[in-house]
Amino acid sequence: MWAIYSYIMIKKKIKIWQIILSILLGLISFSNFAQQEAQFTQYMYATQIFNPAYSGNRGIMSLKFLGRSQWLDIEGSPKTSILAFDTPIGKSENMGLGLSVFNDQIGPVNETNFSIDYAYSIRFMFSKLTFGLKAGVNSMDISFSKLNIYDNTDPYINYVIDNKFQPQVGVGIFFNSEKYYLGLSAPNLLEKRFFELAESSSSFFSRVSDNIHFYLIGGYVFDLIPSLKFKPATLVKAVRGSPIQWDLSLNFLLNNNFTFGIANRLDSAITGLAGIQVSDALMIGLSYDFTTTEIEDYSSGSFEVFIRIDFGTNRKILTPRFF
């Protein structure tokens, strides 16, 4: 009986990896990928934002905050704030629920996103496969009058986009054990068209839209010695119109309490990361990006803070602090 059971489980795992590989190959077929969504360095702790399948994955109710100031010293540079909540639900806790509020400010643009996530897990002996759905709404405000205008006769200087709403529908898949994880997601499958201007007399037409973003995340936890773990992680982001963005982080976890490491955003930034598990319920993480592009002549870098509060920490949970 054990041999039959083992054979069935192996067949299931092979099929799962075939599904994941097929989806990944599908993404690779996209070419000419532009960054339009906000970026953040501590993605391994805020996976729920771009992958709904992560909601409830840690088996505990959590409240998370992430704040980022990008390209310090540059007026109008991106500023991002995220508040997210997730919890397992159901008698067997094979489902997850998540809520998040996301705000991104870049110059005259202020975008806010409200979303709800639902996740469903299929458990195996030492791992689980989770599918997630995301639904929400985006609100965008744009005030061109905030720009430094050289041509005051431009009729569109005073054009204001106020609370332009767009629906959001996203999907994700997340496969993990206690030691490794792999996730693939598209947090919004709908193209967001924020405004269209047309002037027949001058044949002027302009449209601002947001393309579909794809995220691939993965990581592993190595036990170097009983008190030290090595946690490499990577995030690949692709969007039509720009080169693929690749983040790689190398973190260490000391005594299950202190996190430190470095990260690299390919051809963009080198980052230092540090974090502390203040208590069973509270974790604080910090990161500082040193820009490696031409922007470094005008900016002193980018700063990010992450705070996570867990509720019900007396329960036994899967991978409590590793990812």
Regions found by a protein language model. Name each.
Residues 10-20:
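Bacterial N-terminal signal peptides that target proteins for export
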Residues 35-323:
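Subset of outer-membrane beta-barrel
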